[in-house]
Amino acid sequence: MTAESNYLDAIEALEEDNRELALEHARKAVKIDPEHVDAWRVISDASLPGLRSQPTLKQAAQSLTAAKKVVALQPDDLGMWVRGGRLLSDELGLYMEALQWWQDARHQAPDEVTPIVEQAAILADMGLYGEATERLQSIFDENMDLATTQYSRVARLHQMCQLASQQDPKEHFKPWEKHHDGWSAITLRMNKAPISESKIFLIISTPLLMLEVLMAPQVFGPGFGGFCLTSLLILFTVILGMRISRRWFQRLNRPAFNLLRAMDFETSTGYVVIPEDIRISKLFMFILSRRPPAFQERMLKIVDAGDKLKGDWKPT
């Protein structure tokens, strides 16, 4: 059979959601013709478990390898650039490699805004807010077009960076600094799971709302006018409660966000920085259990390897 015949069989198998058979035919196609870009694309697609499932470490690695082949053969395939970047950062936690991946994508598609937004998001997650701000600013300086779905994300990233710029840079948690105050904050909260924003909202707003419902008839009186005033008061309380809850959510869960950053640092660099007592804590297990399976597998391999961070390491 020719490479094209195997490719067509792979497409048919993939449409029937028979991923193993699709992989078998697609691999035969690229063995015959190593530059069959469509077959490599099928390998990347079929290596992933599907929309409702998250890939294992092996599946993510296989899909990423095929995606690299696709962009090498067809550099203008933005879809594969996006897939590779998401696999590197979201599934595997390889933030350093993801930054370079998106930089390569920018060279191939200089007018595309997606690589810049993704770089800014990664830099913000790593605590490098200055660099993230520069990426976001370049979008506006170059008057680049944003998709409707990207506006809210860019606005959220910009707000995060603006708030960070108002803080002392020393307050920004840097996992590679052994004696940073952020480690002490993590230690204090390591035996408690993060508190959800909805729970904070209920704690703050429920007593006030109950009091308003009980007191409103006496204050505003019966009738339609009293009902309208009561509704406005409840609406104001809900909006105020949501704003306060959001603020307290960030403050109370800062140790959890710090630990999340430390975990991302470990998977990005392959170095172990989290102390053992924190690694076996309730907070660490809570966060790890909510990370993708591929991320969890990589984290365990890094811990087993036990490579400690040495010297005065700094991000470059």
Model-derived features with residue positions:
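Alpha-helical segment of the N-proximal tetratricopeptide repeat
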Residues: 1-32, 42, 48-55
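Residue-level recognition of tetratricopeptide repeat
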Residues: 2, 36, 77, 112, ...
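Short coil/turn linking the two alpha-helices of tandem helical-hairpin repeats
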Residues: 11, 44, 49-55, 89-93, ...
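Structural signature of tandem alpha-helical TPR/SEL1-like repeats
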Residues: 16-25, 51-69, 92-104, 127-135
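TPR alpha-solenoid repeat register
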Residues: 39, 80, 115, 148-150
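TPR/TPR-like (Sel1-like) alpha-helical repeat modules
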Residues: 62-65, 124-147, 159-163, 169-181
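Transmembrane alpha-helical hairpins and terminal membrane-anchor modules
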Residues: 192-265
